[in-house]
Amino acid sequence: KKTQNWLTLLVKAVAMEPNSDQLHHSLALAYMAQNENDKAIEHMGKALALNSKKDSYYFELGALMEKAGDYKGAMENMRLAIELNPLHSNAHNFLGYMYALEGHDLDQALVHLKKALTTQPRNGYFLDSLGWIYFKKGESEKALTQIQKAMIYTDPDPVLFDHLGDILFSLKNYDEASGAWKNSLFLTENPKGNLGGEFPDPRILKNKIDKARNLMQQSY
């Protein structure tokens, strides 16, 4: 209810001061909190039209576009954020991780992650992204090192455990891979705290666990 009241006030404020980029930005964030993504994108775009020198606006618009499935638009806005602020570690991480998810430009993805980690060397999510890039490059041992390091600096996270399972599986460590996926499944089905809303698909996790179990049985 407090968020809804705040949203109502911001709508009135924007109507009174339509040329305030800060008010449009605040309204976009309020819509984001209400999961009204289209309206959030609309007002973040208006904030940028009024002030195109704010790297944070480009980053937030990019994140909103990624959530909406507009990956091309998301990546373009991340690049613009980096143009304005070459040390924008979150934008570097975002771009690098998106390249890794798509499985292309992995060398460029690596460049972005190393830049992100230059400013935040103990950011567990950046280390996870770096590990995932190594995994996509077929360098599973390097990937394992980075994921294990990532887990030191983060709270238990289902996505990280899913990644850990995939990496261990690629190294034919089926027992530990199954354990990692079981942890991911538990955290997915019993969410606690703010995990950013990202969760693996439980059905896919269960299939992975079954596959690992079958391979373990075959090895006996």
Question: PLM features: what roles do these ranges have?
Answer:
Residues 16, 50, 84, 119, ...:
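Structural marker of alpha-solenoid helical repeat scaffolds
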Residues 21-22, 55-56, 89-90, 124-125, ...:
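Helix-start (N-cap) detector for alpha-helical repeat units in TPR-like alpha-solenoids
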Residues 29, 63, 97-98, 132, ...:
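Residue-level recognition of tetratricopeptide repeat
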Residues 32, 59, 66, 100-101, ...:
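Position-specific recognition of the canonical hydrophobic site in helix A of tetratricopeptide repeat
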Residues 104, 163, 175-220:
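Terminal, low-structured helical/coil segments at or just beyond the last alpha-helical repeat
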